[in-house]
Amino acid sequence: MDPSQNPNIVHATTIISVRRGGHVAVAGDGQVTLGHTVMKGNARKVRRLGREGQVLAGFAGAAADAFTLFELFEAKLDKHGQLTRAAVELAKDWRTERRLGKLEALLAVADKETSLIISGTGDVVEPEDGIIAIGSGGSYALSAARALLAHTQLDAKTIAAEAINIAGDICIYTNRNVVVEEL
């Protein structure tokens, strides 16, 4: 959905997850857009989840829906203790509970071994190349990260931050106020 189609819902962001050298980094921009207006430039859309902060997560989409998903996912993570199992259990609930079916958000989650996208339709997708990019600037950030991975020796954290910066130069719903978390 075009972020500007419903001016009453907070939309749009860019989140990327990159793996290199045994490290994983998740980065996100700080812009919150309501319709055609930038409401905030320093939102924190990336956080650590789990008892010991062993999972990194970022969200794109409607902010209230994303916070609901963060809470539900973290509860599954606390219960099952393993990223993939928690994601699958959340997806099962998403498909069976009517109230969850209307959530307009995506989650990008990663631990030391696995990166997953949890979609608004209850799908769980593991990217084949270990890179996740979601949100309005996702394809720009994905392209930048792939190029930087292929042609530089930069670490995962630097690549993730630079990919968000590049997306922020192109996508009007993304800014260059980057938050990065790394494992």
UniProtKB/Swiss-Prot annotation:
<keyword id="KW-0963">Cytoplasm</keyword>
<comment type="function">
    <text>Protease subunit of a proteasome-like degradation complex believed to be a general protein degrading machinery.</text>
</comment>
<keyword id="KW-0645">Protease</keyword>
<dbReference type="GO" id="GO:0009376">
    <property type="term" value="C:HslUV protease complex"/>
</dbReference>
<feature type="binding site">
    <location>
        <position position="168"/>
    </location>
    <ligand>
        <name>Na(+)</name>
    </ligand>
</feature>
<dbReference type="GO" id="GO:0004298">
    <property type="term" value="F:threonine-type endopeptidase activity"/>
</dbReference>
<keyword id="KW-0479">Metal-binding</keyword>
<keyword id="KW-0378">Hydrolase</keyword>
<dbReference type="GO" id="GO:0051603">
    <property type="term" value="P:proteolysis involved in protein catabolic process"/>
</dbReference>
<protein>
    <recommendedName>
        <fullName>ATP-dependent protease subunit HslV</fullName>
        <ecNumber>3.4.25.2</ecNumber>
    </recommendedName>
</protein>
<feature type="binding site">
    <location>
        <position position="174"/>
    </location>
    <ligand>
        <name>Na(+)</name>
    </ligand>
</feature>
<feature type="active site">
    <location>
        <position position="13"/>
    </location>
</feature>
<comment type="subunit">
    <text>A double ring-shaped homohexamer of HslV is capped on each side by a ring-shaped HslU homohexamer. The assembly of the HslU/HslV complex is dependent on binding of ATP.</text>
</comment>
<dbReference type="InterPro" id="IPR022281">
    <property type="entry name" value="ATP-dep_Prtase_HsIV_su"/>
</dbReference>
<dbReference type="Pfam" id="PF00227">
    <property type="entry name" value="Proteasome"/>
</dbReference>
<comment type="similarity">
    <text>Belongs to the peptidase T1B family. HslV subfamily.</text>
</comment>
<keyword id="KW-0021">Allosteric enzyme</keyword>
<dbReference type="GO" id="GO:0046872">
    <property type="term" value="F:metal ion binding"/>
</dbReference>
<dbReference type="InterPro" id="IPR023333">
    <property type="entry name" value="Proteasome_suB-type"/>
</dbReference>
<keyword id="KW-0888">Threonine protease</keyword>
<dbReference type="InterPro" id="IPR029055">
    <property type="entry name" value="Ntn_hydrolases_N"/>
</dbReference>
<dbReference type="GO" id="GO:0005839">
    <property type="term" value="C:proteasome core complex"/>
</dbReference>
<keyword id="KW-0915">Sodium</keyword>
<dbReference type="InterPro" id="IPR001353">
    <property type="entry name" value="Proteasome_sua/b"/>
</dbReference>
<feature type="binding site">
    <location>
        <position position="171"/>
    </location>
    <ligand>
        <name>Na(+)</name>
    </ligand>
</feature>
